[in-house]
UniProtKB/Swiss-Prot annotation:
GO terms for biological process: mitochondrial electron transport, ubiquinol to cytochrome c. GO terms for cellular component: mitochondrial inner membrane; respiratory chain complex III. This is Cytochrome b. GO terms for molecular function: metal ion binding; ubiquinol-cytochrome-c reductase activity. Belongs to the cytochrome b family. PANTHER family: CYTOCHROME B. The lineage of its organism: Eukaryota, Metazoa, Chordata, Craniata, Vertebrata. Its main location: mitochondrion. It is a multi-pass membrane protein. It holds the Pfam family Cytochrome_B. CDD domains: cytochrome_b_C, Cytochrome_b_N. The cytochrome bc1 complex contains 11 subunits: 3 respiratory subunits (MT-CYB, CYC1 and UQCRFS1), 2 core proteins (UQCRC1 and UQCRC2) and 6 low-molecular weight proteins (UQCRH/QCR6, UQCRB/QCR7, UQCRQ/QCR8, UQCR10/QCR9, UQCR11/QCR10 and a cleavage product of UQCRFS1). This cytochrome bc1 complex then forms a dimer.
Length: 379
């Protein structure tokens, strides 16, 4: 009799995806982040579902409903902080996952990579809308500033912004629709994740060397299930440390004040995971130029496979490309720092230089480094 695991139409799919899946024997801990992202998504959907049972998406009661969740609901404070800090863990894993893809040349699986970029956009949109829901000062003004950027689009901009707002300012209609979309998008993301995995399993995983490993594969279970569980424990430890000891470390104190359209906070800034893009947006004095730079800072990931000039896939044996990669990492950390600073000297010029360097590294320095390495191979 055939094992049900291999014969049942539904269980067979799970088996071929997570149990008998052939995986390269050499993949390192940098390959753990895919499974961690899946767990983050599941955690966010679960905690979000329970929060939605107590939250009200009305401007007059939203702020108080969040306070009610924290004070009166059984373990409501824990649900709220797991959800808020879970988003931070989600983005840490996301950025490390994308960084891994860049370093080891995983972007050469073009369908998987492009699907990943779409997922990144979807997660960013979800996180932005979720930040608006507590209806604190930074929620309101963050929503106002970011949605207002669309008014820079020629001809249709103003109409588009008013259409998104559902009126002439961020108000009741905006909050209600943001809650609806914030609830809906994670389920769409779950479907996109399945497509992402479908594309990945067409080719199989990449490995640190970047060399095809078809002749050296091992089953995913038990080897990588055990390895992923270790990563999971480490992530849960980090998340619980945040939630139980420093729940407000990554939040903004302004969000503990109810939204007030008549009082603008001195420094409007998004959550830490958007600061790099916010710094790029602010570094350009022109509104439309800033919006384009903001969009391109993420969209540029799509053209990375086209900018690959090296004869080798991975950066593991390419010292010049490694230098450019770590320069990019340092530049992104600089942008993240600048995004959280006020718009004054010397932060303005640092932000502008870091923004120029960001695009320069990806479009010019990385492809040139690879061409030089090709010449060094001959030498």
């Amino acid at each position: 009799m055939t094992n049900i695991r291999k014969s049942h139409p539904l269980i067979k799919i799970v088996n071929n995806s997570f149990i008998d899946l052939p995986a390269p024997s050499s993949i390192s801990s940098w390959w753990n982040f895919g499974s961690l992202l899946g767990i983050c998504l599941a955690l966010q959907i679960l905690t979000g579902l329970f929060l939605a049972m107590h939250y009200t998406s009305d401007t007059s009661t939203a702020f108080n409903s969040v306070a009610h969740i924290c004070r009166d609901v059984n373990y409501g404070w824990m649900l709220r902080y797991l959800h808020a800090n879970g988003a931070s863990m989600f983005f840490i894993c996301l950025y490390l996952h994308v960084g891994r893809g860049l370093y080891y040349g995983s972007y050469m699986f073009k369908e998987t990579w492009n699907m990943g970029v779409i997922l990144l956009f979807a997660v960013m949109a979800t996180a932005f809308m979720g930040y608006v829901l507590p209806w604190g000062q930074m929620s309101f003004w963050g929503a106002t500033v970011i949605t207002n950027l669309l008014s820079a689009i020629p001809y249709i901009g103003t109409d588009l912004v008013e259409w998104i707002w559902g009126g002439f300012s961020v108000d009741k209609a905006t909050l209600t629709r943001f809650f609806a979309f914030h609830f809906l998008l994670p389920f769409i993301i779950s479907a996109l994740v399945m497509v992402h995995l479908l594309f990945l399993h067409e080719t199989g995983s990449n490995n640190p060397t970047g060399i095809p490993s078809d002749m050296d594969m091992i089953p995913f279970h038990p080897y990588y299930t055990i390895k992923d569980i270790l990563g999971l424990f480490m992530m849960i430890w980090a998340l619980l440390s945040l939630v139980l000891f420093m729940p407000d470390l990554l939040g903004d104190p302004d969000n503990y004040s109810p939204a007030n359209p008549l009082n603008t906070p001195p420094h409007i800034k998004p959550e830490w995971y958007f600061l790099f893009a916010y710094a790029i947006l602010r570094s350009i004095p022109n509104k439309l130029g800033g919006v384009l730079a903001l969009a391109l800072s993420i969209l540029i990931l799509i053209i990375i496979p086209l900018l690959h000039t090296s004869k080798q896939r991975s950066m593991i044996f390419r010292p010049l490309s490694q230098c450019s990669f770590w320069l990019l990492t340092a530049d992104l950390l600089t942008l993240t720092w600048i995004g959280g600073q006020p718009v004054e000297h010397p932060y303005i010029i640092i932000g502008q230089l870091a923004s120029i360097l960001y695009f320069l590294i990806i479009i010019v320095i990385m492809p040139l480094a690879x061409l030089m390495e090709n010449l060094l191979l001959k030498w």
